[in-house]
Design a protein with these regions (language model features):
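Juxtamembrane intracellular "pre-TM" segments in multi-pass secondary transporters
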Residues: 5-12, 201-238, 262
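Extracytoplasmic gate region of multi-pass secondary transporters
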Residues: 37-38, 231-286, 343-347, 351, ...
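Extracellular/periplasmic helix-loop-helix junction of adjacent transmembrane segments
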Residues: 38-69
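Helix-breaking motifs and short loop linkers at transmembrane-helix boundaries and internal kinks
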Residues: 49, 82, 103-109, 137, ...
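Conserved MFS/SLC helix-loop-helix module at the cytosolic interface between two early adjacent transmembrane helices
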Residues: 69-108
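Cytoplasmic helix-loop-helix junction between adjacent transmembrane helices
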Residues: 113-153
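Helix-loop-helix hairpin linking two adjacent transmembrane segments in secondary transporters
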Residues: 148-199
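Multi-pass alpha-helical transporter architecture, strongest
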Residues: 189-193, 317-319, 323-324, 407-438
Length: 442
C-alpha cells in the first residue's frame, strides 16, 4: 500500500499547525458548551424539580437526536461548500443557544435550548475532520485528529471547573451565559484567518493526480452510505464507537451527580476533581492516535488502529467498576483518572480509519456518519439509560441507585471491544479497495 508523500507546499507547516490549533480551540469551546450541563444537573434538578429520567433526556437524547441527524446533511453541505464557513456559522448558533439555556424557567424551555445547542454543534466535527484530512498527510493524520480530539478532555476540564465554580458563585443561569459567549469570538477568528485547503492536497501523488482530473461533484448521501456499509470494518467500527460512547457519555453526564450523592462532595470540589480528571484524559486522547500512527508505521499494519481502540476499551472495564462500587474517595478518584486516560484512546484511530476508508469527496459525510452512530447510541441513549435505570433502582437502593445504574451502563464496553477486534479482521482489505478506487478513478 502506498503512503502519502510529504505534505503539500501550498501551506507552510507553521500555517497547518496554526489551522489545527484553531480547529482544536473550536472543539474546546464545543465541549465546554456541551459538558457544562453535567456539573449543573443537581442545582437544575433542585430548582426545576426534575426527575433523573428528565435530566437524562436533557443530557443525552434531546441533544443527540438533532446533533446526530442534522450532522449528516450539514456534512454533505461541507463536502460541497466552504467548510470554514459551515463551521463558523454552526459555532455562532450553538454558542448563542448555550447562553439561552440560562433563561429557561421550566423543563420544556431548557429542553428546546439544549436542542438548539445540538443543532449548532452538528456542524462542528464533520467539516473540521475534512479540513484536517486535507491539511495533513495520511501518515500524520491520526495524530492530527487526536490533537483535535484533545478538545474533548480540555473542553470538559474547563466546563467542569467553570461549572463547579459558577454554580456556587453565580448560579447555574449565569454560568450558561458565561460559557456561551466565547464561541462567537472564536467563530470570528475562523472566518477571518482560516483558509479553505484544496481537497486531497495531502494525499499521495497518484491520488492527487486522480483528484486533479476528477472535478465531479460530491456523491449523493445514499451513495456514501452504501459505500461505507459495504466495508465490514466500518460497520464494526461504527457499532464499537457507538457502544463506547454509550458508556462514555452515560458516565460523563452522571459522574458529577454520582460524586455529590454517593460521596457527599460539595459541587465546587466535584467540579475541581472532574476538571483534573478530564485534563488527565488528554494523555489517552493524544496517545491513541500517536500510538496508532507509530505502530502502523513500524509494522506496516494499520490494523493497529482498531487493536489499540479495542484493547483500551477492554482494559477500562475493571477500573470503571472500581470507581462506582468502592466507597473510599481516594480509590474512586484515581480509578476515574485511569478511565479518563483509556477512554479517549479510541478517538484518533476511529476517525482516522473512517477518513481512510472513503474517497476525497466523502470525507465530511463519512465523519458525520460515524458521529451519527456514536452520538445516537452513545450520547442519545447512554445518559437517558442511566437516568431511567437510576429511577427504577431508587426504591431498592435510594441515594445509591445511580451507582448501580452506572455499573449496568459499563457492561456495554465489553461489547464495544468485540466489535473493534472484529473490524480489524477486514480492515486491510477495505483500505486497499478504497485506495485502488481513488488512484484509478478519473
Amino acid at each position: 500500500m502506498s503512503k502519502a508523500t510529504t505534505a503539500n507546499t501550498i501551506y507552510s507547516p507553521g500555517y497547518r499547525n496554526y489551522a489545527l490549533a484553531i480547529l482544536f480551540l473550536g472543539y474546546v469551546v464545543n465541549f465546554i458548551d456541551r459538558s457544562i450541563l453535567s456539573i449543573l444537573l443537581e442545582p437544575i434538578k433542585q430548582e426545576l424539580l426534575l426527575s433523573d429520567t428528565e435530566l437524562g433526556l436533557l443530557g443525552g437524547l434531546a441533544f443527540a437526536m438533532f446533533y446526530a441527524t442534522l450532522g449528516i446533511p450539514i456534512a454533505s453541505l461541507a463536502d460541497r461548500w466552504s467548510r470554514t464557513k459551515v463551521l463558523a456559522i454552526s459555532m455562532i448558533i450553538w454558542s448563542a443557544m448555550t447562553a439561552l439555556c440560562g433563561a429557561a424557567n421550566n423543563f420544556l424551555m431548557l429542553l428546546l435550548a439544549r436542542i438548539g445547542v445540538g443543532v449548532g454543534e452538528a456542524g462542528a466535527s464533520p467539516p473540521s475532520h475534512s479540513l484536517i484530512s486535507d491539511y495533513f498527510p495520511v501518515e500524520k493524520r491520526a495524530t492530527a485528529l487526536s490533537i483535535y480530539a484533545l478538545g474533548i478532555p480540555f473542553g470538559s476540564m474547563i466546563g467542569n471547573f467553570v461549572g463547579g465554580w459558577g454554580a456556587a458563585e453565580l448560579g447555574w443561569r449565569m454560568t450558561f451565559l458565561l460559557v456561551g459567549l466565547p464561541g462567537i469570538f472564536v467563530a470570528g477568528i475562523i472566518l477571518t484567518t482560516l483558509r479553505e485547503p484544496p481537497r486531497g492536497m495531502s494525499e499521495s501523488a497518484a491520488v492527487k493526480a486522480a483528484a486533479a482530473k476528477n472535478v465531479e461533484p460530491a456523491p449523493a448521501l445514499k451513495e456514501v452510505f452504501k459505500f461505507l456499509w459495504q466495508r465490514k470494518s466500518f460497520r464494526h467500527l461504527g457499532f464499537a464507537a457507538g457502544l463506547h460512547a454509550f458508556v462514555g457519555y452515560g458516565a460523563g453526564v452522571w459522574n458529577a451527580p454520582f460524586l455529590i450523592r454517593s460521596h457527599e462532595m460539595p459541587i465546587t470540589e466535584v467540579g475541581s476533581w472532574l476538571a483534573i480528571i478530564s485534563g488527565i484524559g488528554a494523555i489517552g486522547t493524544f496517545g491513541g492516535g500517536y500510538l496508532g500512527d507509530k505502530l502502523s508505521d513500524w509494522t506496516d499494519d494499520r490494523r493497529w488502529y482498531l487493536w489499540i481502540a479495542g484493547i483500551s476499551t477492554l482494559v477500562m472495564v475493571p477500573f470503571q467498576f472500581t470507581a462506582y462500587l468502592y466507597d473510599g474517595i481516594w480509590t474512586v478518584i484515581p480509578a476515574l483518572a485511569v478511565v479518563s486516560i483509556l477512554g479517549g484512546m479510541y478517538l484518533g484511530p476511529s476517525f482516522a480509519m473512517t477518513q481512510a476508508l472513503v474517497t476525497l469527496r466523502m470525507r465530511a459525510v463519512a465523519s458525520a456518519l460515524l458521529l451519527f452512530m456514536l452520538n445516537i447510541i452513545g450520547m442519545g441513549l447512554g445518559p437517558y439509560f442511566v437516568g431511567i435505570a437510576s429511577d427504577l433502582l431508587n426504591p431498592s437502593f435510594e441515594i445509591h441507585s445511580l451507582r448501580y445504574a452506572l455499573c449496568l451502563c459499563v457492561l456495554a464496553n465489553l461489547w464495544a471491544a468485540v466489535h473493534y477486534f472484529l473490524g480489524a479482521i477486514t480492515l486491510r482489505e477495505d483500505l486497499d479497495s478504497t485506495e485502488v478506487l481513488m488512484t484509478q478513478h478519473s
